Amino acid sequence: METVLRVGVAGPVGSGKTALVDALCKALRDRYRLAVVTNDIYTQEDAQFLVRSQALPPERILGVETGGCPHTAIREDASLNLAAIQQLETAFRPLDLIFVESGGDNLAATFSPELVDLTIYVIDVAAGDKIPRKGGPGITKSDLLVINKIDLAPYVGADLEVMKRDTLKMRGDRPYVMTNLKTGLGLDQVIAFLTVHLAA
């Protein structure tokens, strides 16, 4: 039985989760067999964005409408997501990697360990340089923290050095990456992180 790496992508609304999944799919799709599950409360907006962007063939992208708190669908009752993963694994066996993008949530959001193997947590500079020191499991326990939209720092009065310092303080030796997903800056580091785990 082949093992599919399941990678959860979480973070607040507007932080860049879908942009990250889109960029990763486009960068990895020629080397790995991929699929995506997205979570939205009442729509399939993120799934539709990925289809329009041609991140992957549309049949490899499944949108889950959670109908309530996005946290519940990835933690307390992950059944909708587990069913979507099973559907993709059955239809496209063998797969190497499935991204599970959570709905936008707060800093306390975490994935159920039965749902994903790795978690990437995305925050953005526009929310202010205080975000890393606010903590929460996404900041402190995710396998990779992505600090996105670093190009906006001067416009929102955020100090990237403060963010780096606070991130190191909150995460210890857990990795983090500073990105500007609009230009692709830092994306290679996220890809390198995933490639190590895909090779394991």
Swiss-Prot record:
* Binding, GTP: G11, P12, V13, G14, S15, G16, K17, T18
Give the primary localization class.
Answer: cytoplasm
Q: Tell me where it resides.
A: Cytoplasm
Transmembrane ranges? none
Q: Its Gene Ontology biological processes? A: urea catabolic process
InterPro entries membership: CobW/HypB/UreG_nucleotide-bd, P-loop_NTPase, UreG
Keyword GTP-binding in annotation? yes
Which cellular component appears as one GO term in the record? cytoplasm
Lineage, top-rank taxon, reads Bacteria
GO MF annotation terms:
GTP binding; GTPase activity; nickel cation binding
| Gene3D superfamilies recorded | P-loop containing nucleotide triphosphate hydrolases (3.40.50.300)
Record keywords: Chaperone, Cytoplasm, GTP-binding, Nickel insertion, Nucleotide-binding
Which SUPFAM superfamilies does the protein's record reference?
Answer: P-loop containing nucleoside triphosphate hydrolases
What role is this protein assigned?
A: Facilitates the functional incorporation of the urease nickel metallocenter. This process requires GTP hydrolysis, probably effectuated by UreG.
PANTHER family assigned: UREASE ACCESSORY PROTEIN G (PTHR31715:SF0)
Q: Which family does it belong to?
A: Belongs to the SIMIBI class G3E GTPase family. UreG subfamily.
Q: How does it assemble?
A: Homodimer. UreD, UreF and UreG form a complex that acts as a GTP-hydrolysis-dependent molecular chaperone, activating the urease apoprotein by helping to assemble the nickel containing metallocenter of UreC. The UreE protein probably delivers the nickel.
Q: Return the protein name.
A: Urease accessory protein UreG
Name the gene. ureG
